[in-house]
Amino acid sequence: MPYTSNPAIITQSAGGVGYNIALAAKYAGASVLLSSIVADDLAGRSLLKQLAESELSPKGIKQLNHVDGFRTAQYVAVNDKKKDLVMAMADMAILHDSPPDISDDWQSLVSSRKPKWIVVDANWSATLLSQIISIANKEKVKVAFEPVSVQKSVRIFQPDQQIVTPESVVPRHRISLATPNVFELETMYEAAKKMALFESSEWWESINSFEMSSAGSRDKLVSITNAELVDRGIPQQAIQLLPYIPNLVVKLGDQGCLLVYLLPPGDPNLSNPASAPYILSRATNDSSIVGGLYMRHFPPAEIVRQDEIMSVNGIGDTMLGVLMAGLAKEGARVEELIPVAQQGAVRTLKSVAAVSPEVRGLKGLIGIKKRL
């Protein structure tokens, strides 16, 4: 009821998109370092204490001076009795106004630890995103991007930050993987269109290398996805973004997810009969960059009853964390990891925790047939 206090069940926990992804990846067996910033306030000190007591190390966390006006980022979600989100409030100013020397700390971390992947979420400002991604590119570390929200998803499409540019097409792409939902994908597509990214000569050269035929293309897309998604333009928009982000996992809510990615020349999927239904195009030229285009719709791992749903807040983060744990392994293939990642999401959906501890049970299901 508005304009008055209401009875509620209130719980507190360490969280945030980056924390959840890191914890899920850790549960799934990956070696993970969470890197973020907190203030020297009650929330920041509490978070560092919880990290020290958890499976995640606090060594990647930088604590800023609360006297300088910094506040540890906090997020408050209000859910209804069905556990669906009604309203949320976020204080993320610290992720926008960090001191300029923070990039030196990140550079040192990446140089010393030499990770295979850096996962970055769009809670950071466009300026800081640019710094993080530049460090990853310099160190030849692959970047996975989690858009977080419709509003924040466009932060990689800012002309003044040079993150995604007309020139940053495969193989010069700056982001290797992104995991938007359908609303974020549509917004990212429109932002790229506004930047004229689909008009550059580099984009056209890359798109033409896919050698996609317009004849029967709608029927093929419908056979892989469904008419509703095609009419909405979801697979088409994903394809047009591929030159800039060559691996997309589009979250479709209760419809599962859509995987769209570029195959390199000679990829086993191009000659595997079992993969034929998912090969949207094959390059017949002598391109050393693109061998074909793979698109596959993954239905939900499980239909979860309403009375089994505990929280919807961390399911996407859990899915990405499990996916990254697999991709960090030598030999892992993204299409084989997605069903496992979906199982992780289901376990979190049934848990009161932002990331279900039962994700640990998925360690043995992560395969070793690498593509990314």
Report each predicted region and the residues it spans.
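A glycine-rich helix N-cap at a beta->alpha junction
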Residues: Q50-G69
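Short beta-strand/loop segments at the ligand-binding rim of alpha/beta enzyme cores
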Residues: A136-P147
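Conserved phosphate-binding/catalytic loop of the ribokinase/pfkB sugar-kinase fold
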Residues: I37, H66-F70, Y75-A122
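Gly/Ala-rich phosphate-binding loop of Rossmann-like dinucleotide-binding domains
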Residues: K26, N137, A328
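Glycine-rich phosphate/adenosyl-contacting loop at the front of the ribokinase-like
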Residues: M1-S35, A39-E53, Y75, M87, ...
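Conserved phosphate-binding/catalytic region of the ribokinase-like
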Residues: K152, E190-L372
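Structural recognition of alpha->loop->beta junctions
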Residues: S54-P58, I156-E190, I279, A283-Y294
